[in-house]
Amino acid sequence: MAQIDFRKKINWHRRYRSPQGVKTEHEILRIFESDRGRIINSPAIRRLQQKTQVFPLERNAAVRTRLTHSMEVQQVGRYIAKEILSRLKELKLLEAYGLDELTGPFESIVEMSCLMHDIGNPPFGHFGEAAINDWFRQRLYPEDAESQPLTDDRCSVAALRLRDGEEPLNALRRKIRQDLCHFEGNAQGIRLVHTLMRMNLTWAQVGGILKYTRPAWWRGETPETHHYLMKKPGYYLSEEAYIARLRKELNLALYSRFPLTWIMEAADDISYCVADLEDAVEKRIFTVEQLYHHLHEAWGQHEKGSLFSLVVENAWEKSRSNSLSRSTEDQFFMYLRVNTLNKLVPYAAQRFIDNLPAIFAGTFNHALLEDASECSDLLKLYKNVAVKHVFSHPDVEQLELQGYRVISGLLEIYRPLLNLSLSDFTELVEKERVKRFPIETRLFHKLSTRHRLAYVEAVSKLPSDSPEFPLWEYYYRCRLLQDYISGMTDLYAWDEYRRLMAVEQ
């Protein structure tokens, strides 16, 4: 296994800047401070304040949005990073691992990866993802990609339908159809950072948000050695060349992950498990007393001194015995969060250090907090109680169904843009107004300039005389629509759907 040297991983160069010479410790830190500024001031981060964490279209400011959740993940990520660096310092391994002058960048990459980890999520979270994927599957039928005879292919898009005697083109058609039917928030985050917003972040900072390493066009089983890392799509066909360059710059083998991404993932796991339960109490789905009962019942028999006793029971007892006139709810969750972090953060840090050779190589095929330990059991406890008593609550399910309908409806409303022929859509893009297409013209005007420019740039780079051109053009047209709708906030998507469906406000 390769020697651990983080100077080979924390690459401070950028895609759109000429390579620079040796930098001092302070100069490198300034480069990552620039990354922080670009990220924190980006509109993608601001939009998180009106995107769902658990409860869509929530007006209660005490209930978490994607932004407040991401800020909490950022703090936990910083805590884990500092714990790792502190332990490596005690072991006198900072210099040996090339981290003695990179502790600041190490922390900053983790923090900003945490803050950005949800920027690609569509309105209404996972139900928004499902709506996009279901809508495209019902038109592209990726499962028919291996149909025999080819006349059995049910794809409704002529350019992407399989044809006899066109095997090289059919291979591309299969990839495109599979890719478009696997929209995923993490993959969209990569697309946002690189293609749509051109943030030109350092290679190391982008590596921190490449959570999954499976291409969206992947078909079939994933390698056993990487089945966890390839659990979900991590990037699209449109970013394939960029990810190939990223792997080269970060010395990553195929389907391997950047080391600091494991820290971001652990911070997210720790943060949302407690937060979802607290939000459920805030929403009056259950009381603190009922929550404690649910947790106690789900954990089962335990002894004094067990992790459940030290974390959950301790929080419950302290919140009940507090002599100050304070909210029992607030006190319980404060102690529960503190107790949880005090146990899970050191454990995650030690797991990172214990498995550092595989993590540095990018091949550690697990999450830091998914093993046979009590710490892992505690996270599972929080998740299981949330699934059973929060996500299955009628109010939550109704909002999710409404969100699914909104996203499906918006895609259907904008469908005329996908129905235009290549020549007609090209004319609309060039002229921005075509008299014989009044509906399509007005729909096109509603698309954001950023997304339209990304489409134009991608298509302009394609050789127009190539037989692949119609396939790629349609692919980027679909991406244009997915980019626009997935970039909406929950409230904007809701209002836009009602406006375009002529529903009374």
Swiss-Prot record:
Enzyme Commission number: 3.1.5.1
Signal peptide: none
Key words, A-Z: Hydrolase, Magnesium
Disulphide linkage map: none
Record-linked PROSITE patterns: HD
Top-rank taxon: Bacteria
Catalytic EC class: hydrolase
Cofactor: Mg(2+)
SUPFAM superfamilies hit by this protein: HD-domain/PDEase-like
Domain HD span(s) in chain numbering: 66-273
Entry's Gene Ontology molecular function annotations: dGTPase activity; magnesium ion binding
Any Pfam family: HD
Catalytic activity: dGTP + H2O = 2'-deoxyguanosine + triphosphate + H(+)
Record GO biological process: dGTP catabolic process
Function recorded in the entry: dGTPase preferentially hydrolyzes dGTP over the other canonical NTPs.
Description of how the protein assembles with itself and partners: Homotetramer.
Family: Belongs to the dGTPase family. Type 1 subfamily.
Stated name of the protein: Deoxyguanosinetriphosphate triphosphohydrolase
The organism of origin for this protein: Escherichia coli O127:H6 (strain E2348/69 / EPEC)
The encoding gene: dgt
